[in-house]
Amino acid sequence: MYVAMIIRKYFLIIALLLMPWLAIPSVSAADKGGFNTFTDNVAETWRQPEHYDLYVPAITWHARFAYDKEKTDRYNERPWGVGFGQSRWDDKGNWHGLYMMAFKDSFNKWEPIGGYGWEKTWRPLEDDNFRLGLGFTAGVTARDNWNYIPIPVLLPLASIGYGPATFQMTYIPGSYNNGNVYFAWMRFQF
């Protein structure tokens, strides 16, 4: 119930942040700049999804070289939670997704996150079901230890997938005893 309350509370904020991009009309390819390409991709993923996705958080790992042992001994590194999204593959074979997820953070408190993800996708084998991806996610999160104030995030993404299942991950950079966290989840496409 608490998770549902957090998601409901912050869904409106995330939706309001994404709304201007979703309302932007498409422009010709010759007129596009980097930001217009980004907003067009977000809007197309919102309007024309090919798949609906289930996100299942798998692991958080605090880089041991960047933390005192006393802290890592107390931190939660099993971020159970769930998320949902919608995604599509573009004509170049790259992945685009919109998602919302809630999981238990390092302090075992609920952390919602939502945003847009993009990955350049490679299929190095004859079997096109196998793929590797590198890209980014841009979104908004909120944490208990920051009083659930919405915080924008721009993070790297990497993945390895086969068929409808993808192991996707990011790294949250930081300073000593802060950040420097590897976070990964499974994404299942339907």
UniProtKB/Swiss-Prot annotation:
Site features described as Role in lipopolysaccharide recognition, chain residue numbers = K71
Q: Which UniProt keywords apply?
A: Acyltransferase, Cell outer membrane, Membrane, Signal, Transferase
Q: Identify the domain of life.
A: Bacteria
Q: Name one GO biological process term.
A: lipid A biosynthetic process
Specify the signal sequence span. Answer: 1-29
| Transmembrane regions listed in the UniProt entry | none
Q: Report the Gene3D superfamilies cross-referenced here.
A: 2.40.160.20
Swiss-Prot/TrEMBL induction comment:
Regulated by the PhoP/PhoQ two-component regulatory system.
Where in or outside the cell is it found?
Cell outer membrane
Q: Which reaction does it catalyse?
A: a lipid A + a 1,2-diacyl-sn-glycero-3-phosphocholine = a hepta-acyl lipid A + a 2-acyl-sn-glycero-3-phosphocholine; a lipid IVA + a 1,2-diacyl-sn-glycero-3-phosphocholine = a lipid IVB + a 2-acyl-sn-glycero-3-phosphocholine; a lipid IIA + a 1,2-diacyl-sn-glycero-3-phosphocholine = a lipid IIB + a 2-acyl-sn-glycero-3-phosphocholine
* Residues marked Role in the phospholipid gating (site): Y176
Q: Which GO terms describe its cellular component?
A: cell outer membrane
Instruction: Name the enzyme's class.
Output: transferase
What the record says about disrupting the gene is: Disruption of this gene increases outer membrane permeability in response to CAMP.
The UniProt function text for this chain reads: Transfers a fatty acid residue from the sn-1 position of a phospholipid to the N-linked hydroxyfatty acid chain on the proximal unit of lipid A or its precursors. Required for resistance to cationic antimicrobial peptides (CAMPs). Modifications of lipid A with an acyl chain allow to evade host immune defenses by resisting antimicrobial peptides and attenuating the inflammatory response to infection triggered by lipopolysaccharide through the Toll-like receptor 4 (TLR4) signal transduction pathway.
Complex and partners:
Homodimer.
Give the UniProt family note: Belongs to the lipid A palmitoyltransferase family.
- How is this protein named in the record? Lipid A acyltransferase PagP
Q: What organism does the record attribute this protein to? A: Salmonella typhimurium (strain LT2 / SGSC1412 / ATCC 700720)
Gene from which this protein is expressed: pagP
